[in-house]
């Protein structure tokens, strides 16, 4: 199953929207355990759509669906270079991560199995032995907002930072504040 999030691939800021791609073979496969669990035919595709997606999603307006479909069409027809549009987030993440790591922070999720995690909209940082909640609270005193990794289901201490609101004039300020953070929170 390949799930494509509109906010991740197109940086779409509207309603949350995604598409799930399932091969015909998987879609048409019968699983007795699914039939027993969901009380239906047990055919993966039917169960996935009618008993799983339907129950866990709230739906989306038709205009958003048509807009997302048009973005997908334009991308596959070569009219929309969506990768170029989101490269700015990678540039921001690279600069922000350097500021953090230059000041004693470490990247929590730097590898996906054996491959380095690419820079993008979000990245994760930790600091010493601080829990995610502690780090979140302390960063707020320095004007940095984040979310604790614990709220994302992670068992790792740290926070998730977002690049979306970063602007050129904020990098020097961030650098100054993270230097102050390091001085106020010496690592042993």
How does the language model describe each region?
Residues 6-7, 109-114, 149-151:
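Short, solvent-exposed loop/turn elements at beta->coil junctions and helix N-caps
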Residues 7-10, 24-27, 73, 129-130, ...:
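Short, solvent-exposed loop/turn segments at secondary-structure junctions
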Residues 135-188:
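PLP-dependent enzyme catalytic core of the Aspartate aminotransferase-like
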Residues 61-65, 69, 82-97, 101, ...:
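Conserved glycine-rich beta-strand-loop-beta hairpin in the small C-terminal domain of fold type I
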Residues 16, 119-123, 157-160:
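Short amphipathic alpha-helical segments
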Residues 1-86:
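Conserved core segment of the aminotransferase class I/II
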Residues 21, 124-126, 162-164:
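Short hydrophobic/aromatic beta-strand micro-patches
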Residues 19, 69-72, 97, 101, ...:
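Non-transmembrane alpha-helical segments in soluble domains
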